[in-house]
């Protein structure tokens, strides 16, 4: 009887690990980058509800409120071309896969308001033009992470 219970528990453990493991060490992808940061069809505007709408629409308020996010109002070709700029070290690690834009880009920064709590995620919307630093991976190189706005 003890051996049978052990086998059942082991089988459940293998099943759960097989289900959870792929998301644990998941590398950032170009699809994630596009979903979280690209909004080429719109120009920066002063609508104060832009961030609230976009953060929800792009799935960044499911389960918790993402604290900060940046939307890029440029073409994918222009953003991808940044990957051909000079390499630099990533701000958040020692990886040297980052590249800085040669010119400022039109962006919208979304910041969670201090009093805001899940599930009512409320953001401030700030439009500006800034250089960005992105991490690029693959062959050809494509953006996978927005590292900084400078």
Curated annotation (Swiss-Prot):
Q: Does the keyword Hydrolase apply?
A: yes
Q: Which residues participate in substrate binding?
A: 35, 66-70, 91, 111
Q: Which PROSITE patterns match?
A: RNASE_PANCREATIC
Catalytic site positions: 37, 145
Pfam families the record matches: RnaseA
Gene Ontology terms for molecular function: lyase activity; nucleic acid binding; ribonuclease A activity
Q: Does the keyword Disulfide bond apply?
A: yes
> Which family is this protein grouped under?
Belongs to the pancreatic ribonuclease family.
> What is the designated name of this protein?
Ribonuclease pancreatic delta-type
Q: Which organism is it from?
A: Rattus rattus
């Amino acid at each position: 009887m003890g051996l049978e219970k052990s086998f059942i528990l082991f089988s459940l453990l293998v099943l759960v690990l097989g289900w959870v493991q792929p998301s644990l060490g998941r590398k950032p992808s170009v699809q994630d980058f596009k979903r979280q940061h690209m909004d080429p069809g719109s120009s920066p505007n002063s609508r104060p509800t832009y961030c609230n709408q976009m953060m929800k629409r792009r799935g960044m308020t499911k389960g918790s409120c993402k604290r900060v996010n940046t939307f890029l109002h440029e073409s994918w070709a222009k953003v991808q071309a940044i990957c051909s700029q000079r390499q630099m070290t990533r701000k958040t690690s020692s990886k040297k896969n980052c590249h800085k834009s040669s010119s400022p880009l039109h962006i919208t920064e979304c910041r969670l308001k201090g009093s805001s709590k899940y599930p009512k995620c409320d953001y401030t919307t700030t439009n500006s033009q800034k250089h960005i630093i992105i991490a690029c991976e693959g062959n050809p190189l494509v953006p996978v992470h927005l590292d900084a706005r400078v």
